[in-house]
Amino acid sequence: MLSSLSPYMANPRNTLSQVLNFGLVLSSAFMVWKTLSVITNSTSPVVVVLSGSMEPAFQRGDLLFLWNRSPRVDVGEIVVYNVQGKDIPIVHRVMRVFPDVPTTGGKDVESVEASQKLLTKGDNNLSDDTELYAPGQEFLDRKTDLMGSVRGYVPAIGYVTIMLSEHPWLKSVLLGFMGLMVMLQRE
């Protein structure tokens, strides 16, 4: 077993360089993600459409770019939101905007900013999303539930992530292949 590692032990500088290059790639990707998060004011500035509920506007596997710096959302706008207690982003269209209702949360009503309340629906769905919301929730809160509004998309490119989540063995194969490429890379 140790004999297979001998080419890497013979030149530790080269091995260290490869490990550092791999770390640089990972940290650069993380920095780009965090920079996009700060610029767009969204915890997830890029999402993949996971279902066909927004067809024909967006197909399953489309990659969406979000923006969450607009103070208000309009009827007809396509938004991405998280349901309380679930971690799956949902992409749907705003069907109705309710009047702003200030929620005090134990503070003075005068010092509390009102948050927009929204009702959403998938273009390909028959009814609104109230069944998808958390139990007892009748609408979405703009500040707490929304991840952002869709500002752009790339068709079908996100299908890779769907394949990786539906077929876990593909993830192992891909990670193994990437690790092998890093180890066999010669500079």
Swiss-Prot record:
InterPro entries: LexA/Signal_pep-like_sf, Pept_S26A_signal_pept_1_Ser-AS, Peptidase_S26, Peptidase_S26B. One of its GO terms (biological process) is signal peptide processing. Residues 34-187 are lumenal. Residues 1-14 are cytoplasmic. Signal peptide: none annotated. It is an enzyme of class 3 (hydrolase). The chain crosses the membrane at residues 15-33. It comes from the Eukaryota. It is a single-pass type II membrane protein. Residues 173-184 are annotated as: C-terminal short (CTS) helix. Its EC number is 3.4.21.89. Belongs to the peptidase S26B family. The C-terminal short (CTS) helix is essential for catalytic activity. It may be accommodated as a transmembrane helix in the thinned membrane environment of the complex, similarly to the signal peptide in the complex substrates. This is Signal peptidase complex catalytic subunit SEC11. The lineage of its organism: Eukaryota, Fungi, Dikarya, Ascomycota, Pezizomycotina.
